[in-house]
């Protein structure tokens, strides 16, 4: 088959039918789905079973206990290791694909052999009664800019919009369970460190659902996981930084909160002044001018707030 789709599902009964309908009714038909029910406590498993009975492209696996998204991703990727499939796509159980998503991304990858991973924009909509209007994401389109935005742990790749070349990624041996959560960001950093290339399509190919408490319940896990991956990325981007400087710079670029001591901030500013002098070097294809411009703006704002000179 041309495409495999990884679909983790946990307690998603309210959204799963709409998600599955959007996948199974794609204009591109040559794919199968690996849906992993992560020991859901609701009717997620029953919904998956019912859909699988109607469409043989849906393969369902039920975990006996809840293991979390990193384990589910590792489970699915391990299952695909020996499968002859050209591309792999990600999807989340509470989101909705446009019906031409797979067709457009496959056309792009078929015609751009230099790109390993492609995402797209997304329409963000709110799962509440607030009446807030949907919003359109503004992800960078080019590899050099996507890698620049990795340094802020934001606005790089929208995980449930992504599709990648199976042979290109499976041989990297990525450990998706290296972090407690946020395995997607860890994957993108690992891919960048191995010289893989990214692109985002300009059109929105996904409706991304934002619902209350979507991240609040696991905020500490997210912070620890992203910090771990940020340190991995920053340490390779700037090999001259020592371990303390890497940790502090990673922390403030991701969390962007003033929780550090004055001495820690002085350490960060001094380290940044040192590494930002030469902007001509690009170790992994990142646009350092774009990257440093973004960090400059943030640091200048920070210094003005703190009255640093």
PLM regions and their residue ranges:
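Short loop->beta transition adjacent to catalytic acidic/histidine clusters or analogous donor-positioning motifs
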Residues: 2-3, 24-35, 43, 55-59
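Conserved nucleotide-sugar donor-binding catalytic segment
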Residues: 120, 140-232, 240-248
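Short, well-formed alpha-helical segments that are part of the catalytic scaffolds
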Residues: 12-25
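C-terminal subregions of glycosyltransferases and related glycan-biosynthesis enzymes
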Residues: 193, 198, 210-309
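Glycine-rich, basic loop-to-helix element that forms the pyrophosphate-binding segment
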Residues: 63-83, 88, 104
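Conserved donor NDP-sugar-binding/catalytic core segment of glycosyltransferases
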Residues: 100-134
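Acidic helix N-cap motif at the loop->helix transition within catalytic regions
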Residues: 15-17, 42-50, 96, 100
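A conserved acidic beta->alpha catalytic loop
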Residues: 37-46, 65, 92
């Amino acid at each position: 088959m041309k495409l495999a789709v990884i679909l983790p599902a946990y307690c998603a009964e309210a959204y799963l039918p709409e998600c599955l309908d959007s996948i199974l009714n794609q204009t591109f038909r040559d794919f199968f789905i690996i849906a992993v029910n992560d020991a859901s406590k609701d009717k997620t498993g029953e919904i998956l079973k019912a859909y699988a009975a109607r469409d043989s492209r849906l393969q369902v696996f039920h975990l006996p206990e809840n293991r979390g998204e990193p384990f589910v991703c590792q489970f699915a990727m391990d299952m695909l290791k020996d499968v002859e499939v050209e591309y792999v796509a990600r999807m989340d159980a509470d989101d909705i694909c446009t019906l031409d998503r797979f067709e457009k991304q496959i056309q792009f990858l078929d015609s751009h052999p230099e790109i390993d991973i492609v995402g797209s924009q997304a329409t963000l909509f709110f799962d509440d009664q607030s009446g807030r209007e949907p919003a359109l994401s503004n992800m960078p389109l080019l590899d050099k800019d996507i890698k620049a935005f990795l340094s802020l742990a934001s606005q790089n790749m929208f995980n449930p919009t992504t599709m990648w070349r199976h042979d290109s990624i499976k041989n990297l041996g990525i450990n998706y369970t290296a972090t407690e959560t946020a395995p997607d960001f860890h994957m993108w950093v690992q891919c960048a460190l191995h010289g893989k290339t990214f692109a985002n399509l300009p059109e929105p190919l996904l409706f991304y659902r934002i619902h209350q408490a979507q991240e609040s319940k696991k905020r500490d896990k997210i912070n620890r996981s992203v910090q771990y991956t940020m340190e991995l990325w920053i340490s390779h981007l700037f090999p001259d930084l020592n371990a303390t400087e890497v940790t502090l710079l990673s922390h403030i670029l991701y969390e962007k909160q003033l929780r550090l001591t004055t001495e820690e901030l002085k350490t960060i500013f001094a380290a940044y002044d040192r590494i930002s002098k030469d902007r001509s070097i690009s170790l992994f294809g990142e646009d350092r001018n774009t990257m440093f411009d973004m960090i400059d703006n943030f640091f200048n704002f920070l210094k003005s707030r703190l009255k640093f000179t």
